[in-house]
Amino acid sequence: MAFNKLESSNNQEIISEEVGILKELLDDATRGMAGEQGLTTIQHLVELYDEGDYEALTQAISEMTNDDMVVASRYFSLLPLLINISEDVDLAYEVNRKNNIDESYLGKLSETFDVVAESDNARDILENVNVVPVLTAHPTQVQRKTMLELTNHIHELLRKHRDVKDGLINKDKWYADLRRYVEIMMKTDIIREKKLKVKNEITNVMEYYNSSLIKAITKLSHEFKRLAVEKGIELDNPTPITMGMWIGGDRDGNPFVTAETLKLSATLQSEVILNYYIEKVDNLYRSFSLSSRLTEVSETVAEMAKLSPDTSVYRENEPYRRAFSYIQSKLIQTLLFFKAGNFSKERAAKRLSENVRLGSVSTGEVVADFVHDRLSQSLQAVSQQTTEFYETAEAFHDDLLAIKNSLLENDDSVLISGDFEELLQAVEVFGFYLATIDMRQDSSVHEACVAELLKSANIVDNYSELTEVEKVAVLLKELQEDPRTLSSTNVSKSETLEKELAIFRTARLLKDYLGEEVIKQHIISHTESVSDMFELAILLKEVGLVDTERARVQIVPLFETIEDLENSNEIMKQYLGYDIVKRWIKNSNNYQEIMLGYSDSNKDGGYLSSGWTLYKAQNELTNIGEERGIKITFFHGRGGTVGRGGGPSYDAITSQPFGTIKDRIRLTEQGEVIGNKYGNKDAAYYNLEMLVSATLDRMVTRQITDPDELVDFREIMDSIVQDSNRIYRDLVFGNEHFYDYFFEASPIKEVSSLNIGSRPAARKTITDISGLRAIPWVFSWSQNRIMLPGWYGVGSAFNHYIEAEEGNLEKLQHMFETWPFFRSLLSNVDMVLSKSDMNIAFHYAQLAESEEVRSVFNIILDEWQLTKNVILAIEKHDDFLEESPSLKASLGFRLPYFNVLNYIQIELIKRLRNNNLTDDEISLIHITINGIATGLRNSG
């Protein structure tokens, strides 16, 4: 049975009505700032665009003053944002409605369970499935935290719109509240004045946990267990969703990530989840007013009640309340222990004695608004060291289980549902660490550090000059035969080595105190050899995280370029063959993770080449694991755009090569994608549900493509992809004018100066395309509306194949109909092309200084037109997005506004490059960049 995507159910009538209200309010705010004439100018620009008179539009914008530009840039940036909010509210409404009335939709967990339950190994699948979204700080989320908060206020008001229409809420007050927030938004700085620090990135992401992720993950995990019970499947401790984090641990190309940021990331995460627990326990304290005169309690709960700091005579007969008071006291002590920084009891006590003038224990940080008598007693107990802290989350969980068992034993099981059940579930998922932090560094840094260590220990003077075979021999000898560390406190170290060792020491400390789950992987960027992995092992050995039997941090290679992906098969064959590696993997439950880089492989070889090389690499690596009895699991380094591996998550997962998803999958969530997917608890629940359902679906679905046909399909793809790679590289790396075209006909220079992340736009000074990071590369092509990384080279390659032999078009059409991977591949191109605009791109091309450079656009335009024709022919469609009517309607709402913004951006870039903008006015370009990214929704 086929189900519709939930997005296809959206109510365009309601969205249109809300957009009308929001536009009216934005018009009023604009009129207040710029007068009637200012608003008239804006409306005139929209009319010119609607009429298709782009020359007149360009002329009108060129005649605007810089002051006019200020208002227009804000207007055209904010309206797409307001449209986004309305669409998000409608999606949240549909999520709740369809779940409450038990109506089907694609990816609904209960529907997926029906399929899984029919499998012979249903229990194993459900027990072991684990999907891990990993939040990263890649710089494509350009909104300020303040703007995100305003967005949430408007979101909450729009959620009440249907109640307003039904007369359940006063319309005038609702409208006045909405007007106020739109007015504030119009007069608030949209972009950051200063570049983010790593700490800012960490705290920004933590807001998503507070507002949506903790609630959504807890709810989904509970629903997962409930459905298993409903199907009669007994599970021990399933973890369908856990979270990952790169911020604070990803130092590849980011010199601002240090041991301190790693510790900060871990401790802030602990604070967030402990604050959540403290709040939940407080709620339970308030509600569990059961009297010992009317109900029995277990001896364990009675003992907890005796230890409670709550000695009020009014609660002496309320054992559950006093037990929760005891638990909360321990949680507060635990929180202070982690906030102490060096994880010592003495430091925690000192911090407490300095701050416990109640009202100043940083109670705002610690427990929000819970300053009342009971909390005073809890804090007093903590300050007097009469309450111990929880050394592990398991100990906290045990106390909660004791209360649960007491309720069950005494016929009070009805009280377990609600807050209590949510709290238990949250502890099982998040522990005291909240999310697993990944570490990442470039392989060249590891090599330099190991070379320095080997030289200082008088083992090898010129390690970097050794052959690969010689390097591996040296490294294995140190790992297998010599238990001593290479570093010495008596030998001076380079700044790089000192910094790396400090990070690894901190990782060891965090694992010792917060548990093994807090840091589980270290990723090696640009993995090109086995020695790259053993070099990391040497550094981990220095701090006791690796020995001959066990690696407490798994070594994860990242294969990024086309060449590295093609070589990954041979590299992993060799690596997995070493006895020491076999022992490490055996002690990791026979899992070996491999990260796949979508961004760099795309920049290296184009969309088709990247997608196909990744597909083949997964098949080959999975086979290597199966031959050795090892579960190879993949970490997909996907961005928001198709050019960086993005696209609909459900389709992306269900189109993975058959058999390559065992039970665990990790994938990056970055930039504006985090806000779009997890900005509110309903959207977060839906998107997490999609990930889990898609993974389960791919695990249980039998191969639907005929195996014999698949052999033919692969041969066809090999031929087409080779051609596509050549066409792409001929332009990007072979055309002598392409470099200048990219830097002159796109806002790459302006994007690089945006204050949207702590990491530089390039690892070093940019002298060619290969030196540019993939994110600003893709982001800039999104801004000038060419979207080149998502389609270039596709049209010509397919066209060459079609023209080579009669009937080849029909073969491609058959592949599209029967092969999920191919269908997903082409559907993403369809979506990208729908968001591109060659009229706008033409005007960006005019920014180039010479005719030779501008001529590059003609090459791009010809390929775009060819790609459009070929894709529609293979799909048998007349227009883009025929299978995504909701996205088509969404673009129809927003295109007239953020398309005008592109023309404004072009004019501002002209003025900037002619030195006709002040420093304050330069920020207008950044506002337009923000607005276009907001309108596209997946720009980097």
From Swiss-Prot:
Q: What class of enzyme is it?
A: lyase
Q: Which Gene3D superfamilies match?
A: Phosphoenolpyruvate/pyruvate domain (1.20.1440.90)
Cited InterPro entries: PEP_COase, PEP_COase_bac/pln-type, PEP_COase_Lys_AS, PEPCASE_His_AS, Pyrv/PenolPyrv_kinase-like_dom
EC number annotated for this UniProt entry: 4.1.1.31
Q: Which keywords are on file for this protein?
A: Carbon dioxide fixation, Lyase, Magnesium
What Gene Ontology molecular-function terms does this entry list? magnesium ion binding; phosphoenolpyruvate carboxylase activity
Biological process (GO) annotations?
A: carbon fixation; oxaloacetate metabolic process; tricarboxylic acid cycle
Q: Give the catalytic activity.
A: oxaloacetate + phosphate = phosphoenolpyruvate + hydrogencarbonate
Q: Name the needed cofactors.
A: Mg(2+)
Its Gene Ontology cellular component terms are:
cytosol
Q: Which domain of life is it from?
A: Bacteria
List, from the UniProt record, the residues annotated as the active site of this protein.
H138, K603
Q: Pfam families in the record, alphabetically? A: PEPcase
Which HAMAP family does its entry note? Answer: PEPcase_type1 (MF_00595)
Q: Which family does it belong to?
A: Belongs to the PEPCase type 1 family.
> What does the UniProt record say this protein does?
Forms oxaloacetate, a four-carbon dicarboxylic acid source for the tricarboxylic acid cycle.
Q: What is this protein called?
A: Phosphoenolpyruvate carboxylase
Query: Which species is this record about?
Result: Streptococcus thermophilus (strain ATCC BAA-250 / LMG 18311)
What is the gene called? ppc
